[in-house]
């Protein structure tokens, strides 16, 4: 039995699954949040098994919710240290499900929102085996000390009206990825705040379906 909280998941329409989609929620939420997106996208991704793990820590600024790491101090070097300390626990959750489904990183798609994007991008950059692709909604990139993976394509999606994580963070992430020559795209969505809408989901679906993960 897993040492982490049991989380929601949705089986692929086609069996056995060929891909694993890992949904990483924002701070103060939990896995039940992003699993609610699956009914809107699963018909376009019929060979994908979806999991939405709960953050590995209790949210430390409210009596409910989960977090991937504390945001009480948002200094980049502090956040990087906290992520580095916790990233192996996130990897454990993913690896356990990969083993159950007989899949590997090259079959795995990471989708994050807000703090989930922060953990998802960091996770992607430190892998020794590339993920299929990574999508980040409304988040920021906290660079790791060492980048092991430059092969995973990354898609960044951000609302121009976001006042929680400003759209400037998308451009900061894009500049960082460009310097490392990592394939990526950025999409600024008009009239959207800190949220995911149908336009963003369509971009994500197209991005996933345009990947040829098995060739990586």
From Swiss-Prot:
Annotated InterPro entries: AB_hydrolase_fold, LYPA1-2/EST-like, PLipase/COase/thioEstase
Origin superkingdom: Bacteria
An example Gene Ontology molecular-function term: hydrolase activity
Entry EC number(s): 3.1.-.-
Entry keyword set: Hydrolase
SUPFAM superfamilies: alpha/beta-Hydrolases (SSF53474)
Catalytic center residues: 114 (charge relay system), 162 (charge relay system), 194 (charge relay system)
Family recorded in the similarity comment: Belongs to the AB hydrolase superfamily. AB hydrolase 2 family.
Classification via PANTHER family: LYSOPHOSPHOLIPASE-LIKE PROTEIN 1 (PTHR10655:SF17), LYSOPHOSPHOLIPASE-RELATED (PTHR10655)
Protein's recorded name: Uncharacterized hydrolase RC1147
């Amino acid at each position: 039995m897993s040492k982490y909280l049991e989380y929601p998941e949705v089986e692929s329409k086609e069996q056995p699954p060929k891909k694993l989609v890992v949904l990483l929620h924002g701070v103060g939420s939990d896995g039940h949040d992003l699993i609610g997106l699956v009914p809107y996208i699963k018909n376009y991704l019929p060979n994908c098994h979806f999991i939405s793990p709960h953050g590995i820590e209790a949210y430390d600024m409210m009596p409910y919710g989960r977090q991937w790491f504390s945001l009480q101090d948002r200094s980049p070097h502090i956040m990087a240290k906290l992520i580095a300390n916790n990233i192996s626990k996130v990897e454990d959750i993913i690896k356990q499900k990969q083993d159950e489904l007989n899949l590997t990183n090259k079959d795995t798609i990471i989708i994050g929102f807000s703090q989930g994007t922060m953990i998802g991008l960091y996770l992607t950059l430190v892998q020794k085996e590339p993920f299929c692709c990574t999508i980040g909604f409304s988040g920021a990139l906290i660079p790791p000390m060492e980048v092991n993976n430059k092969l995973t394509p990354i898609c960044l999606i951000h609302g121009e009206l976001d006042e929680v994580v400003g759209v400037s963070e998308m451009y900061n992430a894009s500049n960082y990825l460009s310097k490392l020559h990592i394939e990526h795209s950025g999409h600024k969505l008009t009239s959207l705040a800190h949220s995911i809408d149908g336009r963003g989901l369509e971009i994500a679906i197209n991005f996933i379906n345009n990947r040829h993960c098995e060739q990586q």
